A protein has these predicted regions:
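Conserved short S/T/G-enriched processing/targeting/catalytic segments and their helical context
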Residues: 15-116, 153-155, 162-169
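Short beta-strand scaffold segments in enzyme catalytic cores
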Residues: 28-34, 39-41, 120-125, 131-132, ...
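Short, well-ordered, mixed-charge alpha-helical segments that flank or form enzyme active sites
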Residues: 49-50, 131-133, 140-142, 156-158, ...
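Long, charge-patterned amphipathic alpha-helical coiled-coil/hairpin "stalk" segments used as oligomerization
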Residues: 117-151
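C-terminal binding/interaction regions
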Residues: 108-109, 144, 166-198
């Protein structure tokens, strides 16, 4: 008897579709740390489809608007890419004013019928301002310079707060350590960490 070869990825997706499950690509952790004049955005690399790990080293952090703005995203992948593109368009429209671009995107997201159903969160920074933009039309600016989204977001946020309060670590090291802790707890988060900073 011969072993059956592994199913190609496209067949795996079609099997999920035929099973009647409404599976989406999801699961990630994105963390933003603002400390001592630096802003760091970190994210893990895992992409899951239902309960299957599809990719280990996905890049969920992007530089947009001539590399002047960092954006991290969590949620449905296609939705997140669409929202990042719309945010970049708003940044172009408002000459790089992240505050105005974030508010306009959130308003559009909340009121536009097509956008309203997108399932994603964005973290964005221009090095001074930091925002979380949600699908409910919220633009949130943190009190403590820390933001996190995704399935492991609460773990990463708790770890980052503890490290900020009880250590002298720089922002980059805090982000890396907090993501590692989230990866130890959240099954949808791995330790293939991508970090970028402004």
């Amino acid at each position: 008897m011969y072993a059956r070869p592994p199913e190609p990825v496209w067949k795996l997706f079609s099997m999920y579709a035929m099973s009647g499950k409404n599976e989406t690509f999801h699961g990630t952790t994105i963390l933003l740390v603002q400390k001592d004049g630096r802003v760091v955005l970190a994210g893990d690399g895992q992409v899951t489809f239902g309960d299957t790990v599809i990719k280990q080293r996905a890049r969920k952090i992007r530089r947009v608007y001539n590399d002047k703005v960092l954006v991290g995203f969590a949620g449905a992948t296609a939705d997140a890419f669409s929202l990042v593109a719309r945010l970049e368009s708003k940044l172009e429209q408002f000459q790089g004013n992240l505050n105005r671009a974030a508010v306009e995107l959130a308003q559009e997201w909340r009121t536009d019928r097509a956008l309203r159903h997108l399932e994603a969160y964005l973290l964005a920074t221009d090095g001074k301002n930091v925002y979380m933009i949600s699908g409910t039309g919220d633009v949130i600016e943190p009190d403590d310079g820390l933001l996190a989204v995704g399935s492991g977001g609460v773990y990463a946020l708790a770890a980052a707060r503890a490290l900020v309060r009880n250590s002298k670590l720089p922002a980059r090291k805090i982000a890396e350590e907090a993501l590692k802790i989230a990866g130890e707890i959240c099954i949808f988060t791995n330790n293939e960490i991508i970090v970028d900073e402004l």
